[in-house]
Amino acid sequence: MSLVFAALTIALGARVVTSSAGTDVVTYHNDNARTGQNLNESILTPATVSVSTFGKTGFFAADGKVDAQPLYLSAVTIPGSGTRDVLYVATEHDSVYALDAVTGAVIWRTSLLGTGETTSDTRNCSQVVPEIGITSTPVIDRSRGPNGVIYVVAMSKNSSGAYFQRLHALDAVLGTELFGGPQTVQASFPGSGAGSSNGSVIFDPKQYEERAGLLLLNGQIITTWTSHCDIDPYTGWIIAFDAGTLTRSSVLNVTPNGSRGGLWMAGAGPAADAQGNVYVLDGNGTFDTTLTGTGFPNRGDFGNAFIKIATTGGLSVADYFATFDTVQASNADTDLGSGGAMVLPDLIDANGQARHLAVGAGKDSHIYVVDRDAMGKWNASSNQNYQDIAGALGGSVFSMPAYFNNTVYYGASGRSLKAFSITNARLSSTSTSASAASFAFPGTTPGVSASGTANGIVWAVENRNPAVLHAYDARDLSHELYNSTQAPASRDAFGAGNKFLTPTVVNGHVYVGTTNGVAAFGRLGPAAPTGLRITIT
């Protein structure tokens, strides 16, 4: 690992309106429920976001693809530099950057590559290319360590072909390793499934990838693993680490006596509720249709299911929902695991009863709403979950929904961004508004900015070359406020998109990861911008 304070080449051409507001974005999709909301945004409103007042304010180049969502800390005290708002960017080249969130100036850059290691991979599959470094969104604990900590999982390999998965804890101000890190990810779990040996399945780092964002929950860093390049053997791992020591604290495998069942989730972090339960959607894999007396798979294999994981006393499956045709869906590769899970706020139904719900969707175009207190388990004849909205999305989901003001927003592959209203704790069976634009594979993962319940904007990135940033009125998605193709002379163009992008919207800024850096958007000054570009040398 190396720490670099990089030199900069800065080309100035725009006036940038800045804010001293104190909002942080420390985890994937803004909160552990994964709602994608920032309800403290007072600068960007439907009245202030238009092509004449809003646009690209800079591009912060990096040394690899930015698949992870950029994170943000406000008012960070930097030794010798005063107080700055800081943007944290992780790349597939195994680098983590701390940037001045307004100018893009590099505060520090840390390489997580070990000596003689590389992020190049001879497997050359299309899932994560051309490098295999940092794919998952890190998580920040501002209260831990001397200056706050950013936790990152990095993958690499050496010249002998050995692969490494490591959990790092970096000082948020200095970029240095903390707690004796990094911690090499190793695990085993009782079972006779794929890749097992002597009665245990074994975590083989070359077979796995940490795609889903990290979850910080009650002092634990929870990691969830899927296949590297869809190459067997692999199973479904969830591994927790103590946030203060990086020691492994608990292990769960959700297909220990079968195969597959990876945690893909389009890069979405596992969701958590206020009671400390974790929710995931796993991919096609073994599901035991012989059930115990309490309705659980008799061999502990939960492939292609919506799973609730208890964390008290270690990781364990507390409840689940699987579709009646889960085995057939796995065989046809129409599983749930392509999308992310979201925990909804408590809702009141038509009978006045409080409902504790979560929502997810996968490749079959259904929206599945589950009651977190009784998810529905598996029934051979019909789905037993709280609400099943068939065909509402019109396409497969390789993305994550967002929530705002009793509305759920989904962007299925090849379809428009759609809004589904919630009344009496039930989602509308058809969309209540939709964007005019459609979003090619993999669809879009929206984010929301608002000031409380007012001035809601839904932000979405279109994955194409060049990528397109869209802003919609949250009340009516047919009302587009802005997109980055509207300005003349490619003023707001920002390069090719990535598969699982979600914008970071905070303190008057919008940040979008690309194949070679991060594009910054915000309110424009009186002069039309020509862009600010930061080149790292």
Region spans (language model):
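Boundary at the C-terminal end of the N-terminal hydrophobic targeting segment
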Residues: 14, 19-23
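Bacterial N-terminal signal peptides
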Residues: 2-15
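Inter-blade linker and blade-boundary elements of WD-repeat/beta-propeller domains
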Residues: 379-393, 430-436, 489
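Pro/Thr/Ser/Gly-rich low-complexity, intrinsically disordered linker/stalk tracts
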Residues: 526-537
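Intrinsically disordered, low-complexity serine/threonine-rich segments
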Residues: 5-8, 399, 432-438, 477, ...
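Blade-edge motifs of beta-propeller repeat domains
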Residues: 318, 490-492
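Mobile, glycine-rich extracellular loop/lid and propeptide segments
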Residues: 22-348, 353-378, 394-420, 443-450, ...
